[in-house]
Amino acid sequence: MRAVVLTTYGGPEQLEVSDLPGPAAPDPDGVLIRTAAAAVNPVDLQTRAGLHSAHGAFHPPMVLGWDVAGTVTAVGDRVSGFGVGDRVVSMSAQMATGRGTYAEIVALPADIVAPAPASVPLTAAAGLPLAGLTAWQALDALALPEGATLLVTGAVGSVGGLTVQLARLRGLTVVAHVRSVEDVEQARALGAARVIVGEDASTLPSGAVDGLLETAGLPRAVAAVRDGGRVVSVVPTRVPEAERGVEVSVSYVEQDGEGLAALGALVDRGELEVRSAKELGFEEAGEAHRLLEAGGVRGKLLLLP
């Protein structure tokens, strides 16, 4: 099978397409998925650069990628929830498992797979798993009551944009922080009640919100949270320091087929929008990494076999 592989840590130029042996059959509790698209995420860039090398030995050729959307081509003997031909999505924790999704065929446990939302193109659905589960689980960790005010940084990014939408569905009043005036209308369209523009935290109101969901690693954003409020960061390398009784924690995304199915149902009900930026071929994986590193991407960059 064709796959985008990494044989040594480094820049985007290290990514290349190679022919690898594909999985012959799924595990008894697993499925084989023919990839329609794999999304590009910041964690892929970090892994490629060697920033996560402490998490495990590097065994080249490494296949990157956490997100996949595609069609089931085979099911294990103990799998009852899926059949050949089903359209599905999944998030594979590549950094821990080594099961990357930049490949024509992906073998995954069935319990981390979910039906793909039927209301969007299958390729676009690849942008839902990692960003959606990150936002969903971080909001669970934040556990703000209905009616509370939540500040979301990076509010038009992949995770931030889904966080704004999901927070609104949970009855929270969302204050969105964006870096450019060009992003204000999009933040409002996603459901933000108020939008604040700025390059740093200096434009944020002091002590004005009940909670903060940090997706941008914004210095001093915790100042916007009231005394005794809550902060959850999804940027583990830039976690705000606790102060004034504010609870600060980090949310690490976990594989979750049931949660992903719930997110897909929200998409099909028209309550959650999945945004795509650009589709590129496997041969353009390096360019996709360059685009994401340059910043300013709104929606997911998708790699197609």
Model-found features: residue ranges?
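A short acidic, Gly/Pro-enriched loop at the edge of an enzyme's catalytic core
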Residues: 204-210
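Glycine-rich beta-strand-centered segment in the early N-terminal region that forms part
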Residues: 21-40, 52-94
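Mid-domain Rossmann-like dinucleotide-binding core that forms the NAD(H)/NADP(H) cofactor-binding site
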Residues: 126-200
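Glycine-rich phosphate-binding loop and adjacent beta-alpha segment
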Residues: 215-273, 282, 305
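NAD(P)H dinucleotide-binding glycine-rich loop of Rossmann-like/cofactor-binding domains
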Residues: 57, 81, 91-154
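Residues located in well-ordered beta-strands
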Residues: 2, 16, 34, 69-71, ...
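C-terminal capping/lid region of NAD(P)-dependent oxidoreductase domains
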Residues: 271-275, 289-305
